[in-house]
């Protein structure tokens, strides 16, 4: 069985706990955030510089990465 993938929307300091928890649960973590200085990019397995409000970009990332789920944790858009 292959590793499950989760796309997390946003990589602020408040969201790092969700990224870490997903990794602890065995998920491959994919992150998207338009802020280039977000701390989550250093925790996630893969990072995309894309706005979480850009529905088309988020959809394309999810499709390309073949994620099993999408999580918005402590996001504010």
For each predicted feature, which ranges?
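ATP-binding N-terminal substructure of ATP-dependent carboxylate-amine bond-forming enzymes
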Residues: 1-77
